[in-house]
Amino acid sequence: MRVVVISSFVSVSLQLSFLLLLASAIRSSSSPPNDPFLGISPQDEKYYKSSSEIKCKDGSKKFTKAQLNDDFCDCSDGTDEPGTSACPTGKFYCRNAGHSPVILFSSRVNDGICDCCDGSDEYDGHVSCQNTCWEAGKAARENLKKKIETYNQGLVIRRQEIEQAKVGLEKDAAELKKLKSEQKILKGLVDQLKDRKEQIEKVEEKERLQKEKEEKEKKEAELAAQQGKGDAEEKTDDSEKVEESSHDEGTPAVSQHDETTHHDEIGNYKDYPSDEEPAAEGEPTSILDEATHTNPADEHVVERKEESTSSEDSSSPTDESQNDGSAEKEESDEVKKVEDFVTEKKEELSKEELGRLVASRWTGEKSDKPTEADDIPKADDQENHEHTPITAHEADEDDGFVSDGDEDTSDDGKYSDHEPEDDSYEEEYRHDSSSSYKSDADDDVDFSETTSNPTWLEKIQKTVKNILLAVNLFQTTPVDKSEADRVRKEYDESSSKLNKIQSRISSLEKKLKQDFGPEKEFYSFHGRCFESKQGKYTYKVCAYKEATQEEGYSKTRLGEWDKFENSYQFMSYTNGEKCWNGPDRSLKVKLRCGLKNELMDVDEPSRCEYAAILSTPARCLEDKLKELQQKLEKLMNQDKPQNHDEL
């Protein structure tokens, strides 16, 4: 019995010893690191060294420096155990000198696997980890060196583009100023041409209406002539009967007729109905009929009258008789002139005008309405016309119209008594008419002086001046069609040029309002598009305009230019075409340093939201270059790490 008890006691003692040894081994494997700040990033070291009491980052508790990395989790967020695996949410920082740092979950510490290239995560000695950071960092250092070289070259290009941007902006501003000045001058010229064109069109319209009126009156006169033809023939027959009866009775018909014909005709013309007094029935309805169908008796009277006048001239030796004979002869000549003129112009004058014309010639009274018969010149009138200048007031009273009869007269030369207008007057008036409108351009440019190589604007100014001088709207001849067409053509061309200038001004003003970056480094982007072919799509990004996705002849608008974002790190395009049952398309282009402008890596990370990368010298910043150089210098100055051997 005693032997059994002793053996049981020995067995329990052995088990306890084994458990103690096992616990000791476990305790030894999870022992805290020798470096209390192991696993802490350089940025967080200050947080842990600031005071003797450290607060958990979530603010739940506080712990002392002795509790830091003691292999017991005091903070739920793992703040107190960055270098051990005690807290499941803790993070371990691999320094990896000579290569890139890495952050691990604390659960990987002392797990028998070398996660850090420097082997710092397996510090308990159970696993021997070689330090491979230097070899592993060699490729990273080479990439860093290449990146620094790219920044160096890109920075040179960027500086050049900035200088070019300054020159370009100055050029744009100078061009805008010049165009505004040219616009002001050209607008004045266009306004002058427009005024002259409108004046010509008004005159042409008046001429058209006048021509229609004359054609209408001509038709009415022809109709009246046909209606009065029968009455005129009847009157002729009556006159022949009267003459025959006078001869049969033995009466001196010629002398009586000479004495009474003049007064009878005056009476007939005066008795002709005016505009307010309609002609009585049975009487001739048109003077044109009388002028066209001349009474043979009247012709006989005129001939006999001329014979008696010539005989009286030869039989009367006194001055008084000669004067009377001369006066009668002149009167007869005047009557013949009137008859001839009426015969020639019967188709061009209305019946009222013919009546007033004949009556005024007989009575010596001047008709209220001037007719073309008034244009028949006399010898005295010709002499006075040659020496009498036309005043500006008279020119203004002339509305510039002339009937078709006048035009035919000047062409046929039937009434060549008209003397040509004085050229000196015409030149003087042209000069006055061109000065009737004075634009601001007259203050800036002298039309009389041209350089050996005149600019387009000077050529236009000279052409417009010549046109305005050549086209005289107050002349007494109809508007010259060729000159009118010339005015219209020059107006159209000048207006087109003005529209182009105004469009260019608007474009320049919009351009100068764009955001080209703090140093205008993105000035070269204006008006440029960058393309990238990816699969079946071609992506096109146009700065300050739009971005599109093209497939064959199909085009999808990804967005309109919006702005730069995040300190000019992104270009934003918004309000693209709407996705079916989704949002409007949009695009964000990330800008990075490169030696040329190149669009790449277009993707659609979210539905209808596109992303792309654009390399450009504009993003090769000097501050970023210095940062890269410091990083490389730090890596190169590190000693080559030694192998992490087991202790």
From Swiss-Prot:
Residues 311-320 have a biased composition (Low complexity). Residues 395-410 have a biased composition (Acidic residues). Residues 527-622 form the MRH domain. Disruption phenotype: No visible phenotype under normal growth conditions, but mutant plants have compromised defense response induced by the bacterial elicitor elongation factor Tu (EF-Tu). Residues 206-222, 230-268, 290-308, 326-355, 363-388 have a biased composition (Basic and acidic residues). This is Glucosidase 2 subunit beta. Disulfide bonds join 529-542, 579-608, 593-620. Heterodimer of a catalytic alpha subunit (PSL5) and a beta subunit (PSL4). GO terms for cellular component: endoplasmic reticulum; plastid. Residues 1-30 form the signal peptide. Residues 155-235 form a coiled coil. Transmembrane segments: none annotated. One of its GO terms (biological process) is defense response to bacterium. Expressed in roots, rosette leaves, leaf blades, mature stems, cauline leaves, flower buds, flowers and siliques. Residues 206-453 are annotated as: Disordered. Gene3D superfamilies: Mannose-6-phosphate receptor binding domain. It is found in: Endoplasmic reticulum. Pathway: Glycan metabolism; N-glycan metabolism. Regulatory subunit of glucosidase II. Essential for stable accumulation of the receptor EFR that determines the specific perception of bacterial elongation factor Tu (EF-Tu), a potent elicitor of the defense response to pathogen-associated molecular patterns (PAMPs). Required for sustained activation of EFR-mediated signaling, but not receptor FLS2-mediated signaling elicited by the bacterial flagellin flg22. The gene is PSL4. A motif (Prevents secretion from ER) lies at residues 644-647. It comes from the Eukaryota.
